[in-house]
Every structure is written in structure tokens, then in C-alpha cells.
């Protein structure tokens, strides 16, 4: 398993993961709260690749992707964060191919994100997820992230989202 910055040649693989997740959402086998054609889309991935902040997980093939940057979502401004934003790093749109679910790839991607943030001296970590995404919420809590707020919003064009805002500080967190 390896992680690397995504490049334009990865776009089809990332889009396929998005499509597979949308199909799983539509058939009821996965709950993300995402909507096909609204978010995430090929354009979502393309824009992130062009910005240089999209990363992929490869294990024989591309099985996951995520955006890692310092871009704060608008709804973050009203949350009761414990840590300031000068040294913040945000994980956006973490996806693992549905056929690879349950094999530890999500946990590994979060570990990669934390290591990347540490190497870039960005110890304040933030993640958001749809409140309907119970699997993501459970994973993030298990990895030491604290739910700071649930904010009703229209998120990336999807109305009626209860966005869960999570935080972790690498300097403050000590595993049990």
C-alpha cells in the first residue's frame, strides 16, 4: 500500500470510486449523504488535482483518494474549536472504493493524513462528514477525533446536510 499525490492520469480511477459510492448509496448498501451529479464529481477531483492537494491510495490499483489542505469550509467559522486555525490541516472527501471497504484502508488514509500534517507542522486537524455517515463518524471517533459541532447546512450543493465537524490536535492527543 502506498500514498502519493494524484495526477491527471488518476482522474478516471477517482471518478470510478465516486461512481461506485454513488451506486452503493442508491442501492442502500452505503450511507454517505452524497448525491450523484452533485458531489463529489469528476470536476471535484479534477480541481483538487490541479490545485495539487489530492492524494491517492494504491494497493495494486487506486483504492482511495482524499484532499489534504488548509482550506476551511465556510461553516467551520462558527464552530467551538478548541485549537486555533493558524496551524490547521483539513481532510476533505476521503473515499475508499466500496469493494475495498472493511480492509483498513480508511484508517490507513487517516494515518497518512496525520503524518503528512505532522511533517508540514500543521498539528491542528479537522475533518467533516455528513451526520448520516455513521461509519465515518465511528472511524474518526475511534482514531481520537472529537465531534465539536453538528451544523445544518447546504454542503457542496447538497441541501439539508447536518455536517459533523471533528477536531484533533496531534500535540495534545495521547493514545490510550
Residue ranges and their predicted role:
Residues 15, 22-44:
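Conserved GNAT-fold acetyl-CoA-binding loop/helix
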Residues 51-66:
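Conserved beta-hairpin
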Residues 6, 94-96, 129:
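Hydrophobic adenine-recognition pocket in adenosine-nucleotide-binding enzymes
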Residues 2-16:
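A short beta-loop-alpha structural element at the N-terminal edge
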Residues 67-93, 101, 154-159:
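Conserved acyl-donor/pantetheine-binding loop and adjacent beta-alpha core of acyl/acetyltransferases
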Amino acid at each position: 500500500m502506498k500514498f502519493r499525490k494524484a495526477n491527471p492520469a488518476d482522474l478516471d480511477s477517482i471518478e470510478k470510486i465516486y461512481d461506485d459510492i454513488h451506486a452503493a448509496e442508491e442501492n442502500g448498501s452505503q450511507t454517505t449523504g452524497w448525491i450523484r451529479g452533485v458531489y463529489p464529481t469528476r470536476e471535484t477531483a479534477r480541481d483538487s488535482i490541479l490545485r495539487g492537494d489530492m492524494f491517492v491510495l494504491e494497493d495494486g490499483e487506486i483504492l482511495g483518494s482524499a484532499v489534504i489542505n488548509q482550506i476551511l469550509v465556510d461553516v467551520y467559522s462558527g464552530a467551538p474549536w478548541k485549537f486555533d486555525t493558524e496551524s490547521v490541516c483539513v481532510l476533505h472527501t476521503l473515499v475508499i472504493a466500496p469493494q475495498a471497504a472493511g480492509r483498513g484502508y480508511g484508517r490507513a488514509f487517516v494515518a497518512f493524513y496525520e503524518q503528512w500534517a505532522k511533517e508540514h507542522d500543521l498539528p491542528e486537524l479537522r475533518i467533516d462528514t455528513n451526520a448520516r455517515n455513521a461509519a465515518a463518524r465511528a472511524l474518526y471517533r475511534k482514531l481520537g477525533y472529537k465531534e465539536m459541532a453538528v451544523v445544518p447546512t447546504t454542503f457542496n450543493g447538497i441541501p439539508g446536510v447536518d455536517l459533523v465537524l471533528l477536531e484533533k490536535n496531534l500535540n495534545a492527543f495521547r493514545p490510550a
